[in-house]
Amino acid sequence: MSQLSLRAGCVAGGLLACLALPAQAQFYVLSDLGSLIATSYSVPHGLSENADVVGYSYAGLGAHAFIWTAEGGMQDLGTLGGGNSYGKAIGASGAVVGYASAAGAEHAFVWTSAGGLQDLGTLGGANSYAKGVNAQVRVVGQADTASGAVGFVWSLEEGMQDLTGLIPDPGGWTIEAGLGINEQGVIVAMGRNVFGRVHALLLVPVLDE
């Protein structure tokens, strides 16, 4: 089948048909995802393997996190009681993470279709920000402490944990942010060493003996 016929079939079949195109296809079909109110704006931040999109859109009194799907369009995920929320990443299970204003601060959240928006709390400081999530709904991000910002990992079973504290021998590194997590639990993070240098770091989980 030629690229031209692929393109024609894609246009005729709509967005879902286009998603089945091979990666080397040379044509694209543009789809306007809209906004939460007609005269507003929308900003995407994350994309799943199923082409579900997360981000935020102005909703009248502030920006609200959204999830967009080909089947359901754009859905407002609400807030944590403050004026704003921002969707930042989406996992393979459809869980969305980001952060939202809450009681004068900003807190990391996770949203699921079953549980809605959940405040992940902090590590004793004012703010926290979720930046990545995997299919098991393990969340990574950054949270304030009394001594500065640190990277965290969160799970429903264990809550929010300081990533540096989970490394038996960090070798002088302090994890300042968890930025992504894959299905094997491997975390990509940003850290600072005792000389003040900031590096990209990879954290590989070790099974308990």
Identify what each model region corresponds to:
Residues 1-11:
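Bacterial N-terminal signal peptides that target proteins for export
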Residues 4, 21-209:
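Residue-level hotspots at or immediately adjacent to binding/recognition sites across diverse folds
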Residues 9-20:
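Bacterial N-terminal signal peptides
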